[in-house]
Amino acid sequence: MASAQAETNVGLASEQGPVAQRQRKGTGSGADSPKSNRSSPTQQEEKRIKSEDRTSPTGGAKDEDKESQGHAVAGGGGSSPVSSPQGRSSSVASPSSSSQQFCLRWNNYQTNLTTIFDQLLQNECFVDVTLACDGRSMKAHKMVLSACSPYFQTLLAETPCQHPIVIMRDVNWSDLKAIVEFMYRGEINVSQDQIGPLLRIAEMLKVRGLADVTHMEAATAAAAAASSERMPSSPKESTSTSRTEHDREREAEELLAFMQPEKKLRTSDWDPAELRLSPLERQQGRNVRKRRWPSADTIFNPPAPPSPLSSLIAAERMELEQKERERQRDCSLMTPPPKPPMSSGSTVGATRRLETAIHALDMPSPAATPGPLSRSSRPHSQSPQQQQAQQQGQLPLPLPLHPHHHASPAPHPSQTAGSAHHPASPAGDSRFPLGPAAAMAAARELSGLGPGPSAEPRLPPPPPHHHGGGGVGGGGVGGGGAGGVGSGGGSSLADDLEIKPGIAEMIREEERAKMMENSHAWMGATGSTLAADSYQYQLQSMWQKCWNTNQNLMHHMRFRERGPLKSWRPETMAEAIFSVLKEGLSLSQAARKYDIPYPTFVLYANRVHNMLGPSIDGGPDLRPKGRGRPQRILLGIWPDEHIKGVIKTVVFRDTKDIKDESLAAHMPPYGRHSPAFPLQDLPLSYPGASGALAGAPSSMACPNGSGPQTGVGVAGEQHMSQETAAAVAAVAHNIRQQMQMAAVPPGLFNLPPHPGVGGGVGNVPGAAGGRASISPALSSGSGPRHAPSPCGPAGLLPNLPPSMAVALHHQQQQQAAHHHMQQLHLQQQQAHLHHHQQQQQQQQQQHHQGGHQVAHKSGFGASSSSSASSSSMGQHHAPKAKSSPLRSETPRLHSPLGDLGLDMASYKREFSPSRLFAEDLAELVGASVSSSSSSAAAATAPPERSAGAASAATGADAPSSSSSGGIKVEPITTTSE
């Protein structure tokens, strides 16, 4: 700066501009020239102009004076700074100006300069310093920063770096930006709530115009003197200052004797970019031994998620670590010699001495840091020695292990004595609350998780800072002492625990990088690897494990055996198919509208179309759609009830029947789901099962199509032993699954596969009739899948879903005797009549019961199912007697269903939730809930309806099943075996 001395007047005190230039052209320093031409008119005029200017926007006369003074000194001025206007004008008068001189004035010079500087800032032209905070950075000009802040002036003067990066801690990005704008423009607009923090930071950075910088001026003067001593601009200057410097040097040497080994270090050893300088940082830096200072920041401010700057800094830091390690060996750690407590008067002197000493070492001066300076000077700032002793008294000795720097020890009484004294540690400083990062560091240190093994142990506990009047009284000296030395206890420990810094640093970086990769950066914010690994990492992995487990469970519990998860709800699918049939949307339109994958939608629509059977308008084409002709579904006309029944069967079978029937029990809406389903009560008695209960094989066969056997078995074993029942249930469950897999003949689309098919059609005709005819809903549920060919019981039975089979068997068991007889006859008849009758019944049911009948629709299944549902209901209500025994037993049976919580038996007619589903469906499909209710009614009024079914069902409960749908259950259907 000394070299720029002449310019200081020009650049900084605008009114001196032209004059200063003239002065430069003249002999040089006007103050020394005897001939200064004070009376010349021009000079008078200049004087006048100057005094006017002194009130210029930059801040009033007082500020101007301060500025010129500070800068003149900073320049190392041969010309003593004169603060009186006359002095100033005289200094500009050129001694040799015998000829008249003219003042050339640039009126809007100041505004122009301001504008230009602002433009340079915006365009980042000629920038030579980077300010960073909060992970963001902005480039600025050293000259402007120095002009506006003695803090920056000192800082940048000490940093012999082309383009230093100043990392501000505990500074908000918005505040920093505003302050820099203020320095460049002289004014900013801020909201009210921003003013407080802004002024706090301005105070910290000693920004002229926003903060009182008088305290800094003295320090700056000392700094300037020291720097001018290093690079004297003229021999005369150096001699003038040398004596005082010499004295200062001697005092400083006493102060810094304990740093002796390091005294050899010169700034060249420090890479200035490495000095991460921020006011608070430097304050805290004093706590750390000097050689450790550069990376002290890593300790106090645990690495935040890496910013572009931090990687550079880390690399440089690693090189430094090597040098530091060697240095460390030389630096014997000893506490500074105790000094008698200084009175506040001597504080400033001490400050200066310390400062110059530090300058002599080319070390960044802690004193220059604008620590919060308490205005009231301390009555007695204690010497570093005392402070450290005090601190060690306060902090238990284990502390050096993980220094809780920021946990401020209970302030020592002496500290609290002085008014406005800041508590022992910077963290405690009320005016400078820790930023989030520092707070985190404090917390981490408290919890013993240091940012890394190497950095921590090396920090001796910081001596409490006492900020005395001069700004450095006890604070500076104490800080210096602590910085260089560390407390005795801490030092030995620190050295014992030391890990080679370079290595530790590398390890830390590596861990951090690994963490960033592994944790997708969401744990990256915790600088502490330990913390992340131990807590967040575990949390995350636990969460993932749970997620995976749940996914697997979901897969297993899906109702579909294979294929990806569905992205659509069955209700949506039902609506979409219905809209194709009724609104004439094309398949692709409907798929888009309802957001169902097109191929899936075509699959379901085709299935529905196939099951709808011939269209009312007599369209001739019954063949399944040819490849690439899915749209044919649009051509037919079918009764709404019929359509809804088929849709329920096709669409809801997937979702609602666990492996078909197993879930079916839960679904009231379909026949088998309808609450009326006694079948469900008999859950495990398979049609085959009931018959099979006695003769499992034969009964199983029955469900598959040997009606007579089933019937017989059923009759015989209505009350099987639980063990048998369980065994049968298991077998039945397997068979059920197989049956589910069976192809569904298109003709059977209407069959409620379970009810009609298994029970009604062939196997358990009687039983099925009563119960086997699962409620139409049931049949509809499984119908599509199971619907066997309309032709025969055999076909039907194989398709029976397991639940259907169960239902059939239970019914069979109850009605077994009658059913056997009927089943035999009926089976034969069924083959021929069943299909037609059921279809008729289905249609009737559709009309009568809407949804319910739809369920029944399935050809043979229909009548049987309706009768079954009624009978089952009857059983539940009245006949419950029979069904309930089974039912009560069933839960005990160990069937796969039971494990799934799907025990069929458990669903009793009374179970109203079953009706809920019916209602939902009805809403969806537009069918009235009556269908389900009708089946319930049938069950309730089994005796009346049973007329047809009674004979068919011949079971006690069978009668009720006769017309659950309002359809007469024909004995054939009931017996349908």
From Swiss-Prot:
Annotated spans, Disordered: 1-97, 221-249, 281-348, 362-434, 447-497, 772-900, 925-977
Segments of skewed composition (Basic and acidic residues): 44-69, 316-330
Protein localization: Nucleus
PANTHER family: BTB DOMAIN TRANSCRIPTION FACTOR (PTHR23110), FI07618P-RELATED (PTHR23110:SF109)
Biological role: Probably acts as a transcriptional regulator. Required for the specification of the tarsal segment. Also involved in antenna development.
Main localization category: nucleus
Compositional bias (Polar residues): 34-43
BTB domain ranges (all copies): 127-192
Classification lineage: Eukaryota, Metazoa, Ecdysozoa, Arthropoda, Hexapoda
Tissues where the protein occurs: Leg imaginal disk at the central region of the tarsus and in eye antenna disk at the basal cylinder.
Native source organism of the sequence: Drosophila melanogaster (Fruit fly)
Name of the protein in question: Protein bric-a-brac 1
Top-level division of the source organism's lineage: Eukaryota
Biased composition (Gly residues): 469-491
One GO CC annotation: nucleus
GO molecular function: DNA-binding transcription factor activity; minor groove of adenine-thymine-rich DNA binding
Low complexity composition-biased segments: 80-97, 372-396, 804-816, 838-853, 862-872, 925-966
GO biological process: eye-antennal disc morphogenesis; female sex differentiation; leg disc morphogenesis; negative regulation of developmental pigmentation; negative regulation of male pigmentation; regulation of developmental pigmentation; regulation of DNA-templated transcription; regulation of transcription by RNA polymerase II
Cross-referenced InterPro entries: BTB/POZ_dom, Dros_DevTransReg, Homeodomain-like_sf, HTH_Psq, SKP1/BTB/POZ_sf
SMART domains assigned to the protein according to its UniProt record, in alphabetical order: BTB
DNA-binding region: 569-614, 621-632
Every HTH psq-type domain range: 559-611
A Pfam family recorded for this sequence: HTH_psq
Keywords, in A-Z order: DNA-binding, Nucleus, Transcription, Transcription regulation
Further details from the record: 'Bric-a-brac' means 'jumble' in French (referring to the mutant ovary phenotype).
